[in-house]
Structure formats: structure tokens, C-alpha cells
Design a protein with these regions (language model features):
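Negatively charged, low-complexity tracts enriched in Asp/Glu with abundant Ser/Thr
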Residues: 1-27
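A detector of low-complexity, intrinsically disordered, Ser/Thr/Gly/Pro/Ala-rich segments
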Residues: 5, 16, 31, 73-74, ...
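Low-complexity, intrinsically disordered/propeptide-like segments
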Residues: 25, 29, 34, 68, ...
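Mixed-charge, Lys/Arg-enriched low-complexity segments
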Residues: 51-89
């Protein structure tokens, strides 16, 4: 199982966001930003994973990476787990 090292919290996303450094990388990305956003219109709550430029957490693109999912109670750890990572603080 891979490891997602928590780098820190960032703002500017649709919910409280956390930056992680991944080992091994996910789709070639060492850093990702992950957050959970509330219901938006007809879509339920969503855990979102996007590629980050670096440890700053700035998104390279808002295109969702694998692990993003919609569920009744999504979690950041669930999104990382879907990709085979466990969180290390």
C-alpha cells in the first residue's frame, strides 16, 4: 500500500482541503489536493482529488483524478484509500 504524507491545509477550494505528497506517485503526480464538498445542485457530497503543482496545494487542473467519488458521506481518507494509499501525518 502507498503512503500519503499530509503536507498541510490549504484554502480556495469548495471545502476544507489538504495537500498530500504521495509515494508512489498517482498518475505521475507527486502532490495532490483533496477535499470533501457538500451537495451541489442534484449532485451529492463528493470527495475530490486533483493534481497539485507542489506542496503549496495549487491545483494543476480541476480535472478529478482517480479516487474522487460521490457518496452520502465521502471522506478524504476514503478517496486516498480508493487509490491504495494510507495517510501518514
Amino acid at each position: 500500500m502507498g503512503v500519503a504524507y499530509e503536507v498541510g491545509q490549504v484554502s480556495g477550494f469548495a471545502g476544507p482541503a489538504t495537500v498530500f505528497r504521495l509515494d508512489p506517485t498517482l498518475a505521475g503526480h507527486e502532490f495532490v489536493t483533496v477535499w470533501v464538498q457538500d451537495v451541489f445542485g442534484a449532485q451529492g457530497p463528493e470527495a475530490v482529488v486533483v493534481a497539485a503543482v507542489d506542496a503549496s496545494g495549487a491545483a494543476k487542473s480541476m480535472t478529478r483524478l482517480p479516487g474522487s467519488y460521490v457518496a452520502a458521506a465521502p471522506t478524504v481518507s476514503g478517496a486516498l484509500w480508493l487509490n491504495g494509499y494510507q495517510i501518514s501525518r
